[in-house]
Every structure is written in structure tokens, then in C-alpha cells.
Regions:
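P-loop (Walker A) phosphate-binding loop of NTP-binding proteins
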Residues: 2
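Conserved glycine(s) of the Walker
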Residues: 6
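Hydrophobic positions on the alpha1 helix immediately C-terminal to the Walker A/P-loop
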Residues: 9-14, 29
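Post-Walker A helix-loop "phosphate-sensing" segment adjacent to the P-loop in P-loop NTPases
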Residues: 16-26
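Conserved nucleotide-sensing/catalytic segment adjacent to the nucleotide-binding pocket
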Residues: 26-28, 35-84, 100
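Structured core elements
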Residues: 26-29, 51, 101-103, 124-126, ...
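Glycine-rich phosphate-binding loop used to anchor ATP phosphates in small-molecule kinases
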Residues: 62-121, 166-184
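Conserved NTP phosphate-binding and transfer environment spanning the P-loop NTPase/kinase superfamily
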Residues: 115-234
């Protein structure tokens, strides 16, 4: 599912339910499969694009998935985000008979992510906050705006990101979602709605003044019209 849809929280809850049946989720952390920066794709502004699935070493992911499903041990890579390179350090991994591989990723539905795995061995789950709520003018609240506010608070709390940075970066996120995630929603086995109606009052209390300020700040800035439109809408 898209950014800030609740994938990690859902993963924890899913693992707890499966454990009651004697099964165990084993996460394949695809963040460790990023290409070294010199091999990394760039966007139209020359910035490194971490939002695209092509930023990942898809052949190696498939190689490891095939080996794991065949009962073999693999050496999982480790990506050092400080150096922008894959470390020489690796971690061994081998599946037990009661273990299920979980790919917790923005791009879990992207066909090339699991092209080596037979379809009958996959269960595809999509998650997004599908809130059915209208504003005072009768317009539905956009799901992408909910996720934007979630990510602002998460990035500020856990990554020391100023919410302004998250807003200015969001058009990259949204472009990748529309290109690499949304087209494959119709291939999933089930959809989870992670919307919580009580979210919006909390976000208003924490971010309401900021959105008003951003709308005024970027109103006449031709380079940040996406940020202005999102801030004005929220």
C-alpha cells in the first residue's frame, strides 16, 4: 500500500493472529536491497528517487525469494543509508516449515518484485485509509491528504523531519504511487481499510495552523504549486 497507510501496524496485528495458528511471519526488509547511489535512478530534477521500485535490486530480491522457498539459506544484504552503499555485512536467513515470508513494502504489488514466485504461492494484501467522509462543501476528504498528515507526524517524531520537508516532497511520493502502486490494486486478494474517523481532529490540533501558513507561503510560488494546492485543500 501507499506511504503511511498503516502497513507496519497491520503487519504486527497479522503476525499476532497467525501465531495463534502456529504460523510465523518473517519479514524480508526490502530497504536493504537498494542499489548503491551511483546506480540509483534520478528524477527529472537530478535528485535520487527512492520512491520508485527501480531503486531496488529486483533481480536479487527474486533470487533470494526463490532460494528461500526452495528451503535454501540466503545471505540478506544490509544497506547503509549513511554511505549510500550496500555493506559487506550480511545476515543469514532460512525458512522454517511454519514460517511465511512477508514483503512489507510500498511496492509489494509491483509485478517485478515477485516475478519469480508462482502466483499460487502469493497472497496479496492492500491497505489504505479509505475514509468515507465529506467536508463542509460536500467534497470527500482525499485519502492522500490523510496519509500526508500521518507521514508528517511520523517523520517529525521518528526521523527529525520538519513537516514542511514532508509537504514539499509529497509530490514525488504521489507520482510514484500513481505509477507503481495504484495500477495493481485490482490484482490483490484482499483490501484493508485503515481509516480512523477520529484522526482528523487530532491532525487539526497539531497541524492546522501549519497548513494555513503553508497555503499563504506558497500561494504565489510557481515552483511549489503542488505544496500550495495541498495545503489550501487541507
Amino acid at each position: 500500500g501507499p506511504s503511511s497507510s498503516g502497513k507496519t501496524t497491520t503487519t504486527i496485528k497479522l503476525g499476532e493472529h497467525l501465531a495463534k495458528s502456529g504460523l510465523r511471519l518473517v519479514t524480508l526488509n526490502v530497504d536493504n536491497y537498494f542499489h548503491d547511489l551511483e546506480m540509483h535512478p534520478k528524477d527529472e530534477f537530478g535528485d535520487y528517487d527512492f520512491e520508485t521500485p527501480q531503486a531496488l535490486d529486483l533481480p536479487l530480491i527474486n533470487q533470494h525469494l526463490t532460494a528461500l522457498l526452495n528451503g535454501q539459506e540466503v545471505q540478506l544484504p544490509y544497506y547503509d543509508f549513511k554511505t549510500g552503499k550496500r555493506s559487506e555485512k550480511t545476515t543469514p536467513m532460512k525458512l522454517e516449515s511454519n514460517e511465511i515470508i512477508l514483503i512489507d513494502s510500498l511496492h509489494g504489488l509491483y509485478p517485478e518484485m515477485t516475478s519469480s514466485v508462482p502466483e499460487e504461492m502469493k497472497f496479496k494484501l492492500y491497505i489504505e485509509p479509505l475514509l468515507q467522509l465529506k467536508d463542509n462543501e460536500g467534497r470527500y476528504v482525499r485519502w492522500t491528504d490523510i496519509r500526508l498528515m500521518r507521514r508528517m507526524l511520523r517523520d517529525a517524531a521518528h526521523r527529525a523531519y520538519d513537516p514542511t520537508q514532508t509537504l514539499l516532497h509529497w509530490h514525488y511520493v504521489r507520482t510514484s504511487e500513481l505509477r507503481n502502486i495504484i495500477p495493481y490494486v485490482n490484482t490483490v486478494d484482499t483490501i484493508i481499510n485503515s481509516a480512523m474517523p477520529y484522526e482528523l481532529p487530532l491532525y487539526k490540533a497539531k497541524l492546522g495552523d501549519d497548513f494555513a501558513r503553508w497555503a499563504e507561503q506558497y500561494k504565489d510560488d510557481p515552483l511549489h504549486q503542488d505544496a500550495y494546492e495541498r495545503a489550501e485543500r487541507v
